[in-house]
Regions:
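Shared catalytic-loop signature of beta/alpha-barrel
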Residues: 1-83
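C-terminal extensions of enzymes
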Residues: 67-109
Length: 109
């Protein structure tokens, strides 16, 4: 079985659950002995990175360059030695991903 002291769990907070449901999942897991630091957001994108940082989780799945324009992180923010910085802009940081921002802007017109 799964061990809350050894195993890590991944939930796709952006595409399936959203932040509110992700928080509910963390609360339920906590009631069953799991630390939120054993949960790594699935997705490898800017929203998961922000959720991991905002909730002080143990990490974030990362695969830059895949599933573009949604995957990966803000432009000019490279993964170095296993770390990536958050963009210095308000919000999730989608505006700092030029290809994604262009796509979403064109849909909204």
């Amino acid at each position: 079985g799964m061990n809350p002291e050894k195993d890590f769990l991944q939930f796709d907070c952006a595409l399936s659950y959203g932040l509110v449901e992700y928080l509910r999942i963390l609360e339920m897991l906590n009631e069953h002995g799991w630390s939120s630091r054993r949960c790594i957001p699935h997705g490898g994108h800017q929203m998961s990175l922000n959720i991991a940082a905002g909730l002080a989780l143990h990490g974030n799945e990362s695969y830059p360059g895949v599933f573009q324009p949604f995957g990966g992180f803000a432009d000019n923010y490279a993964v170095e030695d296993g770390y990536v910085r958050l963009p210095d802009i308000p919000g999730i940081g989608f505006e700092a991903k030029s290809d994604l921002y262009s796509l979403l802007s064109s849909i909204g017109k």
